[in-house]
């Protein structure tokens, strides 16, 4: 996940990370502390105050969604190349790319070099966003021609929904909320589980726990 710095921050401890307003940081872990994230900038990593940054979620980033749930979602897509990026279940801090091709869903480990650059094969990138954009026109596979395409959205997707009930996450990658909360819908291509953002967090939530609202909040 990427974030943009809203203010300058000067580290005051060895495990903190300094940055300037406007810097794009790679957030490595959002669960270290209630007020601090672990992030990386220019090959260095450390802790940063969460209120100094603004998260920049991409519609293709699904966080800690389990591999099985990724396969379930992508198998319902109609076109090859439909994809998502998720946090690796087996290697915390790493990422996996899941892509639909034919009747299968293929998974690629997103590798990183010593400088923190991302890659699948040879070409390296400063961010996941750059990697995704490159593989929209260059195959992610060496065995088939698979080009990344955004997950198909259902037409007239509601921008916001409101929670009808409290929901406490049962698995990694799910989004918790309280009754009455407004949730920004990021993907509703699955009939049962939608992706959304609430209180600065993103994740999956059950469709039958919410109701559409006809205004922005």
Curated annotation (Swiss-Prot):
Protein's UniProt keywords contain Metal-binding: no
Location of Phosphothreonine modifications: 211
GO BP term, pick one: T cell activation
Residue numbers of N-acetylmethionine PTMs: 1
One GO CC term on file: cytosol
Effect of residue 193 to F: Loss of binding to AGO2
Modifications after synthesis and translation: Phosphorylation of Tyr-209 in the C-terminal SH3 domain reduces its binding to SOS1. Ubiquitinated by RNF173, leading to proteasomal degradation and inhibition of the RAF/MEK/ERK pathway. In the nucleus, polyubiquitinated by RBBP6 at Lys-109 at DNA damage sites.
Gene Ontology MF annotations: ephrin receptor binding; epidermal growth factor receptor binding; guanyl-nucleotide exchange factor adaptor activity; identical protein binding; insulin receptor substrate binding; neurotrophin TRKA receptor binding; phosphotyrosine residue binding; protein kinase binding
Annotated localization: Nucleus; Cytoplasm; Endosome; Golgi apparatus
Residue stretches making up the SH2 domain: 60-152
InterPro entries documented for this protein: Grb2-like (IPR043539), GRB2_C_SH3 (IPR035643), GRB2_N_SH3 (IPR035641), SH2 (IPR000980), SH2_dom_sf (IPR036860), SH3-like_dom_sf (IPR036028), SH3_domain (IPR001452)
Signal peptide positions (record): none
Cited SUPFAM superfamilies: SH2 domain, SH3-domain
Domain notes from UniProt: The SH3 domains mediate interaction with RALGPS1 and SHB.
Protein name: Growth factor receptor-bound protein 2
Organism: Homo sapiens (Human)
């Amino acid at each position: 996940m990427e974030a943009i710095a809203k203010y300058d921050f000067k580290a005051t401890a060895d495990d903190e990370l300094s940055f300037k307003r406007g810097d794009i940081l790679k957030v490595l872990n959002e669960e270290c502390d209630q007020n601090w994230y672990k992030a990386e900038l220019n090959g260095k990593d450390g802790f940063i105050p969460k209120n100094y940054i603004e998260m920049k979620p991409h519609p293709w980033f699904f966080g800690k969604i389990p591999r099985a749930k990724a396969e379930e979602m992508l198998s319902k897509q109609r076109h090859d190349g439909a994809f998502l990026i998720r946090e690796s279940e087996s290697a915390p801090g790493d990422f996996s790319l899941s892509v639909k091709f034919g009747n299968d869903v293929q998974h690629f480990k997103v590798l990183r070099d010593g400088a923190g650059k991302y890659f699948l094969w040879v070409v390296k990138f400063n961010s996941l966003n750059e990697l995704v954009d490159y593989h929209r026109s260059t195959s992610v596979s060496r065995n088939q021609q698979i080009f990344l395409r955004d997950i198909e959205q259902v037409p007239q997707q509601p921008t916001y929904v409101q929670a009808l009930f409290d929901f406490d996450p049962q698995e990694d990658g799910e989004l918790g909320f309280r009754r009455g909360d407004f949730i920004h819908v990021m993907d509703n291509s699955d009939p049962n589980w939608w992706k959304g953002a609430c209180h600065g967090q993103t994740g999956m939530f059950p469709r039958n726990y919410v109701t559409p609202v006809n205004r922005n909040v």
